[in-house]
Amino acid sequence: MDSQRNLLVIALLFVSFMIWQAWEQDKNPQPQTQQTMQTTTTAAGSAADQGVPASGQGKMITVKTDVLDLTINTRGGDVEQALLPAYPKELGSNEPFQLLETTPQFIYQAQSGLTGRDGPDNPANGPRPLYNVEKDAFVLADGQNELQVPMTYTDAAGNTFTKTFVFKRGDYAVNVNYSVQNTGEKPLEVSTFGQLKQSVNLPPHRDTGSSNFALHTFRGAAYSTPDEKYEKYKFDTIADNENLNVSSKGGWVAMLQQYFATAWIPRNDGTNNFYTANLGNGIVAIGYKAQPVLVQPGQTGAMTSTLWVGPEIQDKMAAVAPHLDLTVDYGWLWFISQPLFKLLKWIHSFVGNWGFSIIIITFIVRGIMYPLTKAQYTSMAKMRMLQPKIQAMRERLGDDKQRQSQEMMALYKAEKVNPLGGCFPLIIQMPIFLALYYMLMGSIELRHAPFALWIHDLSAQDPYYILPILMGVTMFFIQKMSPTTVTDPMQQKIMTFMPVIFTVFFLWFPSGLVLYYIVSNLVTIIQQQLIYRGLEKRGLHSREKKKS
């Protein structure tokens, strides 16, 4: 039925628009023309209320493992630079991707320490602690599975605070252990804190290639509590001083961008306060402050937290903290995207090529949906067979729309045809297509993943636009093979140009997604022929040549 064919086109266009609109809404705020230096009233739960200090000047030390290259400031022990050697900045480049950065153009830091009444990071107690370290460079040696970087500070009262970074081979999770030795006569009250701060405006050199047409990924903050497993918090919301202030046992706070994330995970049994803050000068923050801990005189207290700094590898993130893997943002169809990704990853474990894995999963998905596809084509064929009767009825009844509607429904009932029978299978298939889109866009495994020939990065658009053109050709063949009774010249022109419109639209889509649609269209052609043969035997389809 032609109305159902038109519905298919409208649905595809609507879904495409939804994809574009979703990424538009999650896109990071546009740079402002002028930074404001105006002082504002601090919202409850912000950094100032929490006693979280600003960064200071100190000596820089470097820490290198097989997967991390960090720079830590001895003033406060903040991580100010983070390079990821396993992930090049660009395809074919020897320059590693930089996640954390401290430059005049851009700030992105992972801060941590001890605040609270007696904490050395409390601004009321003076400047942030200047830690002593044994050396300026630490390297995880070959055959070494763990690297510890201890930093010590002794206050004026003789109390010793030790902050130790613990790195493990192949791990993007860094434990930060605190030891508080109370040599005084009064209890010390301290609280661990972890804070991520970042410039709202994204300079050109930080562009990860995720801002192409229709491909805007979420960049901002997020947090998790036992009650709210995963909640995003936009940078512009923080910049508007609409700040987060929640208490939670467990959970985490994070900053996200396409493929990569940083997160602080408090490791304690008490209550933590999660907050966001507008720090001014175009910088926003999200962090946590733990419940105060008392260290009695002559005793040593121990506390810990974990910093994730690296790619969004789902299984590794899930092992670090509950729901941390949800930072791989698959949108509202995550419950479909996640199983699809697990299936794709399982296929890749045998095939070894993500492109061929996409081809295989396309066959699997289309195979599962074949009964729906068959039901759709069968319903459309039955509707086509009724067209002569419907046309005769319209001519007989003239402009009497009410009688036309009544007799048409009676005809459907007599012929046992559901006029919406071709729509329901289509509606069911659309979420799967959308889920595949989100999966292919959000999975780090496909970043810089080669396929074959000229396709060296499945997460990027085809540099020569060959795949989008092939996709358009397959759409053209499907259209030519599909029977139609369209007589309106305008509708004919619209249908004729549909493959061209979709080809142009897909020029900027990642090649992995376009590859999926090409294979899906080829499967459609095969399934179409099989279904039509069965319909011919039932007298519901004829091989008449389509009118152009």
UniProtKB/Swiss-Prot annotation:
Gene this chain is encoded by: yidC
Biased composition (Low complexity): 29-42
Upper taxonomic lineage: Bacteria, Pseudomonadati, Pseudomonadota, Gammaproteobacteria, Enterobacterales
GO biological process: protein insertion into membrane; protein transport
TM stretches of this protein: 6-26, 350-370, 424-444, 458-478, 499-519
Similarity annotation: Belongs to the OXA1/ALB3/YidC family. Type 1 subfamily.
Top-level taxon in the UniProt lineage: Bacteria
UniProt entry tagged with the keyword Transport: yes
Subunit structure: Interacts with the Sec translocase complex via SecD. Specifically interacts with transmembrane segments of nascent integral membrane proteins during membrane integration.
UniProt cross-references to PANTHER family, sorted A to Z: CYTOCHROME C OXIDASE ASSEMBLY PROTEIN COX18, MITOCHONDRIAL, OXA1
Name of this chain's protein: Membrane protein insertase YidC
